[in-house]
Design a protein with these regions (language model features):
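Post-DEXD/H (motif II) to motif III coupling segment of the RecA-like Helicase ATP-binding lobe
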Residues: 1-63
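Conserved nucleotide-binding/hydrolysis micro-motifs of P-loop NTPases
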Residues: 10-15, 52, 68-73, 122, ...
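Conserved SF2 helicase motif VI
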Residues: 12, 178, 186-208
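Conserved interdomain linker/interface between the two RecA-like ATPase lobes of SF2 helicase motors
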Residues: 38-115
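A conserved SF2-helicase RecA2
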Residues: 46, 50-60, 202-264
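SF2 helicase motor core recognition
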Residues: 57, 160-179, 196-200, 286
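Conserved helicase ATPase core of P-loop NTP-dependent helicases/translocases
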Residues: 115, 124-126, 133-168
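DEDD superfamily 3′-5′ metal-dependent exonuclease/proofreading module
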Residues: 246-324
């Protein structure tokens, strides 16, 4: 007699980096293609889109505030799946993110529980020391001390926790009503998990405010706008706000491709030739390289680490020449 088994999960996806011909690319791993030793579940019958979950009232409403951030100095690590720790920390310092966070926290008297993400322990300690009623949590925080800080945070004796690579997965505090990110990331998984801390519903909060100082909203879009789409009979891909393609493309091109094969870094003429190369990072992101002031093109040549993620821009700068 045939047996039918229905699988249900609240975490249908896993994002991983695979090595392809053009370097690391992002892959959406569903329940039907996770194992190399055969699949227990053969078919996906239904996917609940995040938009549906929001409409049904299972997520707290999210509000976003985004600020200008120059991604030009960020460098991908050897895996191609994330930026290097040093370039993340330098960008935080060079763009004065700490002072911006301090000013923002002071403006938000209505927010009762604020979780802040920054790159390093030193930066977290410095920041928390300049914010009233704040504490630091990181991987080296003693277990008992961490438990006490979180307890006082839940009791609203501590208003702000500044964290370094912790409290991103599995941390559940429904009254959390503000998230601030000062940590750059190339990982949609990190962004999804971090914002997810604020999606729990609670009678004492009307929404969760997400304050982005590092360009994550521009790169990935709002988390509640992510959606899954089946590509053919078996493959699924993840897309974001504005139909940005998140998976199935090189990691360094997330935020550049749109659903339907549109590449935002190139403008193609009717005859199929490429008319212009567009900036894919930095303060002139979205502008033709040819319109970038010569002094800034010269600065990029002298300061940017070049790789597959920005090589087209470098080639266009070299073609244009003339930095005067």
């Amino acid at each position: 007699k045939a047996t039918h088994i229905l699988g249900l999960t609240a975490t249908p996806l896993k994002l991983q980096s695979n090595l392809g011909e053009t370097g690391p690319y992002s892959k959406l791993v569903m329940l039907t293609n996770r194992s190399k030793n055969g699949m227990f579940f053969k078919f996906i019958l239904h996917v609940s889109q995040i938009q549906d979950i929001v409409k049904l009232g299972y997520w707290s409403p999210l509000e976003y505030q985004s600020y200008d951030f120059d991604t030009g100095a960020l460098v991908y690590n050897s895996s191609g799946a994330e930026y290097t720790h040093d370039s993340i920390a330098r960008s935080y310092e060079n763009q004065n993110i700490g002072n911006k966070i301090i000013k923002k926290v002071a403006e938000m008297a209505d927010r009762k529980a604020i979780l802040v993400a920054v790159p390093t322990i030193e930066q977290a300690t410095n920041l928390a020391g300049r914010i009233p009623n704040a504490a630091v949590v990181h991987g080296g925080t003693p277990k008992d001390e961490r438990k006490q800080i979180i307890k006082e945070f839940r009791e609203q004796k501590i208003r702000v926790i500044v964290q370094v690579n912790v409290l991103t997965i599995g941390f559940d505090y429904p009254e959390l009503d503000c998230l601030i990110t000062g940590r750059s990331t190339a990982s949609i998984s990190w962004w999804y998990q971090f914002v997810g801390r604020g999606t729990r519903i609670h009678d004492n909060k009307k929404n969760c405010l997400v304050v982005d100082f590092v360009g994550s909203v521009e790169k990935f879009g709002k988390v509640e706008e992510l959606y899954y789409k089946q590509d053919g009979k078996e493959n699924w891909e993840l897309y974001g706000e504005g139909k940005k393609q998140i998976t199935g493309i090189p990691m360094h091109e997330i935020g550049i491709h749109l659903e339907g094969g549109i590449n935002l870094s190139e403008k193609v003429d009717e005859d199929g030739s490429i008319e212009k190369i567009y900036m894919t990072f930095g303060k002139y992101k979205g502008k033709p390289v040819s319109s970038v002031p010569p002094y800034y093109r010269k600065w990029m040549v002298d300061n940017i680490t070049w790789g597959p993620w920005n090589i087209k821009v470098k080639e266009e700068i070299e073609r244009l020449g003339n930095f005067k």
